[in-house]
Amino acid sequence: MSPRPEDDDLVIEPADDEGLHYGNASMEGTSTGQRPYIRLTSQLRNATKSSGDEVRFKCEALGTPPLKFIWLKNNGPVEKTKRVKIRDKENSSRLVITQLDVLDSGYYQCIVSNPAASVNTTSVLRVNNVPDAVKLSQKKGSHHSTKHIAFDEYEDYEMMDRGRLPDEEDADLYRVPDSAAGSNYAPVAVSERWLDGIKYRVGDCVQYRGEACRQYLSNKFVMMTNESREEMYDIDRNLRAAMLFINGAPTISQKCRQLSQAVACHHMYKVCESDSNNQIVSICKHDCDVIQNDECPSELALAAQHELVGDTPKALFPLCSRLSSTSNCIPVMSTALQSSPVAEVNRGHLTHWCYVNSGTQYEGTVAQTSSGKQCAPWIDSTSRDFNVHRFPELMNSKNYCRNPGGKKSRPWCYSKPMGQEEYCDVPQCPSDMYPHLNDKKVEGSTKGGVSESVTALWDSLDPTMQVALVGGGVFFSLLLLLLFCCACCCRAKKKSQKTRHQNAHCSSAPSVINSAANSAYYRKLNGTSTPIMGRVPPHVEMTSLLPSAQHLGPPPYPMDQHLQQARRFPSQEPIDDNSYKVFEITPSQLSVREKIGEGQFGVVHSGIYTSGLFAPEPMAVAVKKCRHDATNAERAQLEQEIRAVATFDHPNVIKLIGVCYMDNSLLAVFEYMVHGDLHELLKVRVPPADHDMGGITEANAEFLYIATQIALGMEYLASMSFVHRDLATRNCLVGDTRTIKIADFGLMRTSYGSDYYKMLHRSWMPVRWMSKEAIEQGRFSEASDVWSFGVTLWEIWSFGRQPYEGASNQQVIELVANRHLLECPHNCPTNIYSLMVECWHENIERRPTFSEIRSRLQSWSLASPAHSILQQHNNRAGSHSGSSGAGRPPTHQRGYPSQKLHRRVEGASPLMKRHDANYAYSEDGDSD
């Protein structure tokens, strides 16, 4: 075991560098001058406990300066309570949780940091629920044999096992991480870590397998002269940078480039005679004198001015006077001239180790992002802005990092597998290196010269003058903005006054109002956009357009009068109606087929839409319309729903194709997925009893893909301030390639009658998917949709089972009120069920948002699909992993009669509402 710092002032730095992260001696907080380092000495173990038990985690590390410990649960800080205690010491930290609850399940991470680096270790805690009867028997049996152990009595925990598995102890003993050298060093590629896997000891001779001096030191042995592998990698790194600078300098001859590289390699690396003989062979003194005096005198003089000659660690060339005249030496003259000449550097391109300015001319071979993901080939890019057709130079760039067109601040690429734009882990060249490779404007353009002149003029100004100019510009911009706002307000005021005057004038002309011909004329005049969307200002409610009773005569058609009146008042002023413009479909383009379902506020039919802009061939659609006996309020409700969904444009939300006037009725035409809904797909995919682990892994990967799409769609709806109120698998339609689209047709389908319950003074409600505040108070918000999303996840991983199956709807209401949560589905990953429990948090402020859920699901999809699968071999009968109290009645018990199915023909209302405030039911029970 490695030495550990004791309690006195003596700090012992480990003798080896196994798993060490080093920093720079000049880092902040290193007052002793000692090189900062950090190493994690133990790993957290996964734990499975029962509710009521306690768990103890210990995190240990070594390092200097002093270490800082942070505990996280599911990426959030662990809060200290009466049950949760944290004690930090100099080199360890302990987390103790007593009286465990199923809500304590999750990922626990210990992060240790100091100025050198930051390391971490993670454990998965799973807490299983234990029935009350079992708890009582355990408590009685152990009352006289055990006692509660105080937190201060855990001192013997210091000597416990450090949590390291045997295979973890022996694996990768000598592997150094990419970040071991600190943030100021450019990481070395994995293929260039030629010392990894070798027992490192100062003074040993090791065969050189590096990159910088491969041309001269191949198959030769070099002495390990530095304290760690990383410092030996620094030699290769510095040599590569220096040689690239020399090769790019136009004043250095081709011969001197070859000679300087050979001399630098044999000087910075101490060459041994053999692996068994540790005697160093130096450069021949005669060759050194010839190079210094005859071949490259000016180049060596320039190097001496920059302190590159001598025996310092940065010196590339030796002092010839200090070399011995022995015959056992290295003839660098013949070695350099016999090797292949150094290729001329293309002045228009950059070398592979760093980039200049924004990296427009970078042509290196780095193919990894800063987050460690592999880059996707440019030829596979489907982006309209960055592809091989727009930038032909990307054709031969494979999957290397580039900055085509200089649109980004540094080289980047599309990362696998999601195709996200990410910056690459490429260092930037020093500011004074490669001045001829600075980004230039296109030749023949005068804009580049003007911008450079302005930049030079700005740099020449005094800082006080620069601040004054910036302040004046900001003040002038604010003044212009204020004047513009005043002008807009005045124009809007005049416009509203003129509109009121025109409306008053139009109301005195009943012959025009009651003319159906004029109504059709104005529709034709205004184009194909539906007048109800484009001719009513957005802030006017549709119910306000209902005419007064004294002006209503016998309607010429059975359609609602306020819809006709909205058509008869074409605005004399142009109105910005882009947000509500809906495509109008002619009756000849739409064929209405069989009825799919029926609710209080409408009927849904399947249909075929032809000759449309959205599809050159016939496409399946869903047609929603009012019932033939619908009231004006119900027709206005359909109108309001069209307003709501008209602006929706997202690949995971059902899209309104247009509206159609057929048989004097208004029809809303939606896209429809011919593969049915997600619930039907899940029931078909129920696995057999003897399914293997491979099938579970494949199913989990597909489920995660489906859940991510639902989260994306709900995130979009939340950003549009809309609340769905009925999110479930029955309302998720399945398209080609498993594309999921969120809809709200489930309420209208009789096959899902058992999913809804007619509540007192309310409509039919999906109580099995509703949160406590939605059931008891009628409060709907994004938080209540998040609760429904958690139940939808439960549906997915249980292959379409009904939540709380076996219990009646009234019993479900009581279970939700008493915090009886759904149990963890069989073979459900721990992180997925942990997310479900977070969605069901009693405090709505503690539930995650859809943006957080989407981000978390996307990050999990990048990991191995089987990453979080925990086998559930224990007997699950009678247990309830998601409850904070007594277990919910197990499914399919005879003591709980199944709910009688009711066919709903009334009481429903549109499910998606604008979320201007938390939606609440009124006292009279009306849902609007």
Curated annotation (Swiss-Prot):
The gene is cam-1. ATP binds at residues 596-604, 624. Expressed in AIM neurons and in several head neurons. Isoform a is expressed in some head muscles and in several head neurons. Isoform b is expressed in several head neurons, in procorpus and isthmus pharyngeal muscles, body wall muscles, and to a lower extent in intestine, seam cells (V cells) and distal tip cells. Changing residue 744 to N: Severe loss of kinase activity. It is a single-pass type I membrane protein. It catalyses: L-tyrosyl-[protein] + ATP = O-phospho-L-tyrosyl-[protein] + ADP + H(+). Residues 200-332 form the FZ domain. Can use both Mg(2+) and Mn(2+) in vitro and shows higher activity with Mn(2+) but Mg(2+) is likely to be the in vivo cofactor. Disulfide bonds join 59-110, 205-272, 213-265, 256-296, 284-329, 288-320, 354-429, 375-413, 401-424. It comes from Caenorhabditis elegans. Residues 1-17 have a biased composition (Acidic residues). CDD domains: CRD_TK_ROR_like (cd07459), Ig (cd00096), KR (cd00108), PTKc (cd00192). Belongs to the protein kinase superfamily. Tyr protein kinase family. ROR subfamily. One of its GO terms (biological process) is motor neuron migration. Residues 488-928 are cytoplasmic. The keyword Kinase applies. The keyword Iron-sulfur does not apply. Autophosphorylated at tyrosine residues which are probably located in the activation loop (residues 724-732). Autophosphorylation does not increase kinase activity in vitro. This is Tyrosine-protein kinase receptor cam-1. Residues 873-888 have a biased composition (Low complexity). GO terms for molecular function: ATP binding; frizzled binding; metal ion binding; transmembrane receptor protein tyrosine kinase activity; Wnt-protein binding. Residues 1-34, 873-928 are annotated as: Disordered. Glycans are attached at residues 24, 46, 91, 120, 226. Disruption phenotype: RNAi-mediated knockdown in a lin-17 n671 mutant background causes 8 percent of animals to produce more than 22 vulval cells (overinduction).
